[in-house]
Swiss-Prot record:
Pfam families: Aminotran_1_2 (PF00155). It comes from the Bacteria. It comes from Alkaliphilus oremlandii (strain OhILAs). Substrate binds at R24, H136, T357. Pyridoxal 5'-phosphate binds at G111, F112, S184, D209, D210, A211, H212, T240, L241, S242, K243. The modification N6-(pyridoxal phosphate)lysine is found at K243. This is 8-amino-7-oxononanoate synthase. It catalyses: 6-carboxyhexanoyl-[ACP] + L-alanine + H(+) = (8S)-8-amino-7-oxononanoate + holo-[ACP] + CO2. The lineage of its organism: Bacteria, Bacillati, Bacillota, Clostridia, Peptostreptococcales.
Length: 395
């Protein structure tokens, strides 16, 4: 007889999700993550992937990964501070710094633990973290791990941010303003020039999580800082290596001092095995490609503008997105989930985003258009949206 707890309290919570119509099961992808993929045994147009540039199954990245496995093996075998810091890790960090036009970079195992580890390492008791209210969960968790005080400012509200800075400038040793570069649920871009201007006025540091800006905005995907021409004015820039780059990992770009400190106090670096050689090699190849051509980012933006125009013409509410992220805002959580299920039945996979990821009453289908989509695929997706929208009396 098992002594494992029944976890009835969790069963009750799961039943609540089912009663609310927001319970979901993990979809199973069979094969590579591409514009058309096999999901749960069915071929679908994939509008849910963060694979912005189509790099996740690119032959050049796969070739680089295979060659790295043959030379270095399948794993690094240790944390970076012991014997898991291979020469290719150092090469990647230097390549990323060159790409981002920063002095130095430290790469991490994921974007999430990059935020969680960096925020905790660069702040302490006597500091103040000032965070946009819509920042990513990894920023929230990173701030929770810090001993610094925390406060939020209204989303992209510069008047409110200045009020917070003015009220606290004499109370703390350091103030750190944290913002997403691109907000993942709405696709809007942070007013970074204004944020940097206020930071300089009140002697605060700036920290930009550019998970959805890296590989998308700026010259050939150099990010939000590059997009606004703010090099040398942002203290910390976070990027992921799993979205536009198509592999896995994250990094923080900034000063050599920052990198040196994180090698001593960045807890994910100290206590978790470093990225495997195959991932490092594939990432390096992706960065090489972005540094030599704008082909992929150009195609991404062309597809995004095409899809947005088609959806707007149908009368869907796509919010105020300024990036390829295209939210189709339904509102009601149960209807949002139903819309997603009906799309899947008709061969289009789009994730339903509902509370608690977004506020109640703002459920949406987050469409992720990529460089890998063809116009024909996007047209089929739009027609499917139209069909389901009419069936549900939403058009």
């Amino acid at each position: 007889m098992s002594n494992v707890h029944e976890l009835n309290f969790l069963k009750e919570k799961i039943q609540e999700l089912k009663d609310q119509g927001v319970y979901r099961q993990l979809p199973v992808l069979e094969g590579p993550n591409e514009a058309e993929s096999i999901l749960n045994g069915k071929k679908v147009i994939n509008l849910s992937s963060n694979n912005y540039l189509g790099f996740a199954n690119h032959p050049r990245l796969k070739k680089a990964a295979i060659e790295a496995v043959e030379k270095y093996g399948v794993g690094s075998g240790a944390v970076r501070t012991i014997v898991g810091n291979m020469d290719i890790h150092e090469i990647l960090d230097k390549k990323l710094a060159e790409f981002k036009r920063e002095e130095a970079v430290m790469s991490f195992q994921s974007g999430f633990n990059c935020n969680a580890g960096t925020i905790q390492a660069i702040t302490e008791k006597g500091d103040l973290i000032i965070s946009d209210e819509l920042n990513h969960a990894s920023i929230i968790d990173g701030a929770r791990l810090s001993r610094a005080d925390k406060t939020i400012f209204k989303h992209a509200d510069m008047n409110n941010l200045e009020e917070v800075l003015k009220a606290n400038r004499d109370k703390y040793r350091n103030m750190l303003i944290i913002t997403d570069g691109v907000f993942s649920m709405d696709g809007d871009i942070a007013p970074l020039p204004d944020i940097v201007g206020l930071a300089e006025k009140y002697n605060a540091m700036t920290y930009v999580d550019d998970a959805h800006g890296s590989g998308v905005l700026g010259e050939s995907g150099r990010g939000t800082v590059d997009h606004f021409g703010l090099h040398g004015r942002v203290d910390f820039t976070i990027g992921t290596l799993s979205k536009a780059i198509g592999v896995v990992g994250g990094y923080v770009a900034g000063s050599a001092t920052m990198r040196d400190w994180l090698s001593h106090r960045g807890r994910p670096l100290l206590f978790s095995t470093s990225l495997p050689p195959a991932a490092i090699a594939a990432i390096t190849e992706a960065i090489n490609m972005l540094m030599t051509t704008t082909e992929y980012t150009d195609r991404l933006w062309d597809n995004a503008k095409y899809f947005k125009a088609k959806m707007s013409q149908l009368g869907f509410n796509i919010g105020n997105s300024q990036t390829p992220i295209t939210p189709v805002i339904i509102g009601d959580e149960a209807k949002t989930m139903e819309f997603s299920r009906k799309l899947l039945e008709n061969g289009v996979f789009v994730s339903a985003i509902v509370f608690p990821t977004v506020p109640k009453g703002t459920g949406r289908l987050r469409c992720m258009v990529t460089a890998g989509h063809t116009k024909e695929q996007l047209d089929r997706a739009v027609e499917t949206f139209k069909k389901v929208g009419e069936e549900m009396n939403l058009l």
